[in-house]
């Protein structure tokens, strides 16, 4: 297993080009199964989860290749089962189920893996597909869905906001007979991006980005070319990198309008921020950040995927900040690792109280999930001495060449292969 060795402290400064959003590229790749003609998807990040998805689509019989863009031709899909050996590393595989049952009348997906943060049941996906008329059984570790003829449009009220289930229902409903309405739908930018992709292929989806999405079913979807939205979480991570190191940064190829809650908290922390249509600049003018208090909540609230990075910000800030995590359980696993580097914090159930310290010290730490691993790498950049971050396969699942981008900002970071 690779690890990162980081020598600090450094003040990070410079420019970074943001990659396409993993959380939009994944549902879009799975939604390409609905298309009867070839699709070209641009701005797809180079990540382990993307590679796994491309491999999975290939196993289902789609022709998939990458040459700059990702090209998917699902016209000859003839296998309707996503096997355990690919699904076990990535919970996003459940997104194959809706398109398979909607287009082919059958699909089965092994129960998924992914980050070890709390319970992420597939119940809401199953509930949604059942409302559309699919018969679903769970057996031998697989979710198996079938339907006679086409799925039927339905009025579906979600009892919990779920990005994953909203994507499943919206994708499947594009080929259903009649109209589907999803109430209490997730509002994330990645939902909007997936809807825009499907509409490019001929779907009739309106209301994405609000809590009520309407899908008028169509008989078939064709091909098209689509560009994935920039990654707001990668953008936020690099903005925090500059903030915690008292540095400055310009993020290019990004979408400031998807980051309102994060930018507001960075301004509160003392950052000088300017935005253009596709760029954000942040300058700390050499100052230490101020602690901030917030609760994570579904979009447009503060994103849970930025919570670990802001925990780090609070732990090196002036003052005390309180962070309450309302989305996932077990999402403070980075905090004990940061305490080993000299941070001061108490965890009380779903809240962490962060007491800012003036400096951290390098230590050997272990990544436990994707965003936690990013906060540990950033901690290494600002800590005095050497930090090694183990289990960085987590970070490769969600960040496109993070060490190259940090190095361009002045970080002293190297990837150490296991045999060295």
Swiss-Prot record:
<protein>
    <recommendedName>
        <fullName>UDP-N-acetylglucosamine 1-carboxyvinyltransferase</fullName>
        <ecNumber>2.5.1.7</ecNumber>
    </recommendedName>
</protein>
<feature type="binding site">
    <location>
        <begin position="160"/>
        <end position="163"/>
    </location>
    <ligand>
        <name>UDP-N-acetyl-alpha-D-glucosamine</name>
    </ligand>
</feature>
<keyword id="KW-0133">Cell shape</keyword>
<feature type="binding site">
    <location>
        <position position="305"/>
    </location>
    <ligand>
        <name>UDP-N-acetyl-alpha-D-glucosamine</name>
    </ligand>
</feature>
<dbReference type="InterPro" id="IPR036968">
    <property type="entry name" value="Enolpyruvate_Tfrase_sf"/>
</dbReference>
<dbReference type="GO" id="GO:0071555">
    <property type="term" value="P:cell wall organization"/>
</dbReference>
<dbReference type="InterPro" id="IPR050068">
    <property type="entry name" value="MurA_subfamily"/>
</dbReference>
<keyword id="KW-0131">Cell cycle</keyword>
<dbReference type="GO" id="GO:0019277">
    <property type="term" value="P:UDP-N-acetylgalactosamine biosynthetic process"/>
</dbReference>
<feature type="binding site">
    <location>
        <position position="327"/>
    </location>
    <ligand>
        <name>UDP-N-acetyl-alpha-D-glucosamine</name>
    </ligand>
</feature>
<dbReference type="InterPro" id="IPR001986">
    <property type="entry name" value="Enolpyruvate_Tfrase_dom"/>
</dbReference>
<feature type="modified residue" description="2-(S-cysteinyl)pyruvic acid O-phosphothioketal">
    <location>
        <position position="115"/>
    </location>
</feature>
<dbReference type="GO" id="GO:0008360">
    <property type="term" value="P:regulation of cell shape"/>
</dbReference>
<feature type="active site" description="Proton donor">
    <location>
        <position position="115"/>
    </location>
</feature>
<keyword id="KW-0808">Transferase</keyword>
<keyword id="KW-0670">Pyruvate</keyword>
<dbReference type="GO" id="GO:0051301">
    <property type="term" value="P:cell division"/>
</dbReference>
<feature type="binding site">
    <location>
        <position position="91"/>
    </location>
    <ligand>
        <name>UDP-N-acetyl-alpha-D-glucosamine</name>
    </ligand>
</feature>
<feature type="binding site">
    <location>
        <begin position="22"/>
        <end position="23"/>
    </location>
    <ligand>
        <name>phosphoenolpyruvate</name>
    </ligand>
</feature>
<dbReference type="InterPro" id="IPR005750">
    <property type="entry name" value="UDP_GlcNAc_COvinyl_MurA"/>
</dbReference>
<keyword id="KW-0961">Cell wall biogenesis/degradation</keyword>
<dbReference type="InterPro" id="IPR013792">
    <property type="entry name" value="RNA3'P_cycl/enolpyr_Trfase_a/b"/>
</dbReference>
<dbReference type="GO" id="GO:0009252">
    <property type="term" value="P:peptidoglycan biosynthetic process"/>
</dbReference>
<dbReference type="Pfam" id="PF00275">
    <property type="entry name" value="EPSP_synthase"/>
</dbReference>
<dbReference type="GO" id="GO:0008760">
    <property type="term" value="F:UDP-N-acetylglucosamine 1-carboxyvinyltransferase activity"/>
</dbReference>
<dbReference type="GO" id="GO:0005737">
    <property type="term" value="C:cytoplasm"/>
</dbReference>
<comment type="function">
    <text>Cell wall formation. Adds enolpyruvyl to UDP-N-acetylglucosamine.</text>
</comment>
<keyword id="KW-0132">Cell division</keyword>
<comment type="pathway">
    <text>Cell wall biogenesis; peptidoglycan biosynthesis.</text>
</comment>
<keyword id="KW-0573">Peptidoglycan synthesis</keyword>
<feature type="binding site">
    <location>
        <begin position="120"/>
        <end position="124"/>
    </location>
    <ligand>
        <name>UDP-N-acetyl-alpha-D-glucosamine</name>
    </ligand>
</feature>
<keyword id="KW-0963">Cytoplasm</keyword>
<comment type="similarity">
    <text>Belongs to the EPSP synthase family. MurA subfamily.</text>
</comment>
